[in-house]
A protein has these predicted regions:
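ABC ATPase NBD Q-loop/coupling interface
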Residues: 87-100, 349, 354-374
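Catalytic Walker B motif of ABC-type/P-loop ATPase nucleotide-binding domains
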Residues: 183-187, 458-462
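Hydrophobic anchor residue at the start of the ABC signature
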Residues: 172, 447
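Conserved ABC ATPase "signature" region
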Residues: 136-154, 411-429
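Helix-to-loop junction immediately C-terminal to a conserved catalytic motif
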Residues: 75, 345
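Conserved ABC ATPase signature
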Residues: 158-162, 166, 433-437, 441
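ABC ATPase C-loop
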Residues: 175-176, 450-451
C-alpha cells in the first residue's frame, strides 16, 4: 500500500472512467489524543471535533502544536502501540481511519516523497491497481485526474523531469483517481516556489469543486487558503484553542493568533528582524580570518552539475561567494538549486568545471575531495529533508555529535547544547527522538546541528520551511548572529521574507 498516495478500500465502479463522486466524508473526534512512544507528554489530548461532509477546514497552529499529528491520525498513519498511545476516539464516516483509508487521501509537504514510479501515467495508476480497480477503468481515470489538476504532460513523461509544483499536482491526481471523500493537505505548498504554490492551490480548488470532498488543510500561513476554506481550527498547547468561521476567528483573535505564531495576512516580519548587517570595510577582519565581504571563500568556475554526465541539470555556472556574507539562491522548482548546493558542499562531484573553497587554515580546493575530518568545522550542510541528517536517539545526543567529533569534552558541549535548544525553542524536546518531532521542529534541529559545529561556510537548503511566525524569527535571528560572527551563509530558499 502506498502511504504517500494514501487511500484504500475499493471505490465504486465508474463505466465511463470518471472518478466516482459521492458525499464528502464525516470526521468525528471525542476526547482524542496521541502521545509518542518515549515521550512523557501527549502531543494532543482531549480533542473534540466534528467536521461535516463537504466542509473545508483550515487547521492553524504554532510549530509542534500537533497539527501534523492530527493529520496522521485522520490518515490512519500513526501506527500501533509501539509507535505511541492513543486516547479517546477518532473516526472517519463512523469507523477508525485505518479502516477507512478508501475514504481518505493525504497530500504531504515534500514533492519528492510522493512520487512512486518513473512515468506519470504509471504513478497515477499505481494506487488504483492496489485497490483492484478494473483495468478498463484505470487509464480513463488516469487521464481524467491529470486533466482535473491541470497537469498536461504525456502519460509516459518521466516523473524525474517534473518541477516541484508538477509533482504535487501529480500526487493530487493520484489521490483523486482513487475517489476519496476526505482530502488531507499537510502544508502541501511548503517546499514550492510562488508559481508552484499557485498551481497546487488552483488544482486543489478544481478537485474540491468537482468531487465535493471534505477538505482539511494544515498551513502556517492563512493567505494561501483563505478563499477556499469556510472554517478555521486553531491548535495550540495540545488542544483546540479556537474554532469558527475564518473571518470571525481572525477578527476576534487576530492578536492572540499572532502571539501564538500564526502568519496573518499583511504580516511584515522583516521589521522585527531589523536591517541586515552591512558588510564592513575591507580592513575589517572576520573572526575566521580574511577580509569579510572582500575576500572570496568559494569560487565556482564553468561548473556543470547533475547526477549523470549524459543528462546534466545545469552548466556554465560561474559564481564568487564572499567571506562572511549571506548569499541567497532563488529560482523555480526544478532549476537545480539543491543539486548546486550539494555540489558546493562537496557531497556531489562536479560533472565539469571547478569548485574552489579557501578556508582560514589553508585547507583549500574542491570539498568533494576532502576527508570527513577536513570538512568538520569548515563546512556544514542543512539538507532539504531534515531526516537525512539525524543519527542519534535523542535531540540532545544529535546536537552533541559534531562537537564530540571535533574533540570537545562533555563539559564543553553541554552549555552549547543548552544554548542552541533554547534559541530554537527545543528545550522541552531534548530527550525526544528526532524522528518524532514535527516538520518545523526537525528543520530547526537540523539547522542547530550544523551551526553547533561552528563551520566557516554553512549551506542551507530551504532553512525556514515549516516554521510558524515565532520560530521563523528565532531561526533567522540565530543565523543573523552566526553571520555577525563571520560565518558565510549560502541559502537555497523560496521564502521572500527570508531573502
Amino acid at each position: 500500500m502506498d502511504e504517500a498516495h494514501s487511500a484504500s478500500s475499493r471505490p465504486a465502479s465508474s463505466p465511463d472512467g470518471q472518478v466516482p463522486l459521492g458525499e464528502g466524508a464525516r470526521v468525528c473526534a471525542r476526547g482524542w489524543g496521541w502521545r509518542h512512544a518515549g515521550r512523557k507528554n501527549a502531543v494532543l489530548s482531549g480533542v473534540d471535533l466534528d467536521i461535516a461532509p463537504g466542509e473545508r477546514v483550515l487547521v492553524l497552529g504554532p510549530s509542534g502544536s500537533g497539527k501534523s499529528t492530527l493529520m496522521g491520525g485522520l490518515a490512519g498513519l500513526l501506527g500501533g502501540a509501539e509507535e505511541g498511545d492513543a486516547t479517546g476516539t477518532l473516526t472517519v464516516d463512523g469507523v477508525a481511519p485505518a479502516e477507512a483509508r478508501g475514504r481518505v487521501g493525504l497530500l504531504m509537504q515534500d514533492p519528492e516523497a510522493q512520487v512512486v514510479l518513473a512515468r506519470v501515467g504509471d504513478d497515477v495508476a499505481f494506487g488504483m491497481e492496489n485497490l483492484g480497480v478494473a483495468r478498463e477503468e484505470i487509464w480513463p481515470r488516469v487521464e481524467n485526474s491529470l486533466e482535473a489538476v491541470g497537469l498536461s504532460v504525456p502519460l509516459d513523461h518521466s516523473t524525474t523531469e517534473l518541477s516541484g509544483g508538477q509533482k504535487q499536482r501529480l500526487a493530487l491526481a493520484s489521490i483523486l483517481a482513487m475517489g476519496p471523500g476526505l482530502l488531507l493537505l499537510d502544508e502541501p505548498t511548503a517546499n514550492l516556489d510562488p508559481s508552484g504554490v499557485a498551481e497546487v492551490r488552483a488544482a486543489v480548488e478544481t478537485v474540491v469543486e468537482r468531487t465535493g470532498a471534505t477538505v482539511v488543510v494544515v498551513e502556517h500561513r492563512v493567505d494561501v487558503w483563505a478563499s477556499l476554506v469556510d472554517r478555521v481550527i486553531v491548535v495550540a498547547d495540545g488542544a483546540i484553542a479556537a474554532d469558527g468561521p475564518l473571518d470571525e476567528v481572525l477578527a476576534q483573535q487576530g492578536d492572540a493568533l499572532r502571539e501564538r505564531g500564526i502568519w496573518l495576512p499583511g504580516d511584515d516580519v522583516a521589521a522585527e528582524v531589523g536591517p541586515a548587517p552591512k558588510v564592513p570595510p575591507a580592513s575589517s577582519e572576520s573572526p575566521e580570518g580574511g577580509a569579510r565581504g572582500t575576500t572570496p571563500i568559494t569560487r565556482v568556475t564553468d561548473l556543470t552539475i547533475g547526477y549523470d554526465a549524459s543528462a546534466p541539470v545545469r552548466s556554465g555556472i560561474d559564481l564568487t561567494i564572499e567571506r562572511g556574507v549571506s548569499t541567497c539562491i532563488v529560482g523555480a522548482n526544478g532549476a537545480g538549486k539543491s543539486t548546486f548546493a550539494l555540489t558546493l558542499a562537496g557531497l556531489l562531484p562536479p560533472l565539469a568545471g571547478t569548485v574552489e573553497v579557501e578556508t582560514a587554515d589553508g585547507t583549500d580546493g574542491d570539498p568533494h575531495e576532502w576527508s570527513s575530518k577536513q570538512l568538520l568545522g569548515r563546512m556544514s550542510m542543512v539538507f532539504q529533508e531534515p531526516e537525512y541528517q539525524f543519527l542519534a536517539a535523542t535531540v540532545a545526543e544529535e546536537l552533541a555529535i559534531g562537537p564530540r567529533a571535533a574533540g570537545m569534552t562533555d563539559e564543553e558541549i553541554a552549555p552549547l547544547i543548552d544554548e542552541h535548544l533554547e534559541a530554537l525553542g527545543l528545550t522541552k524536546l531534548a530527550r525526544a527522538n528526532p524522528m518524532t518531532l514535527s516538520g518545523g521542529e526537525k528543520r530547526r534541529l537540523s539547522v542547530a546541528t550544523a551551526l553547533i559545529s561552528a563551520p566557516e561556510l554553512l549551506i542551507l537548503d530551504e532553512p525556514t520551511f515549516g516554521q510558524d511566525r515565532g520560530t521563523w524569527l528565532g531561526l533567522v535571528r540565530l543565523l543573523r548572529a552566526a553571520l555577525e560572527r563571520g560565518v558565510t551563509l549560502v541559502s537555497i530558499t523560496h521564502d521572500p521574507a527570508f531573502v
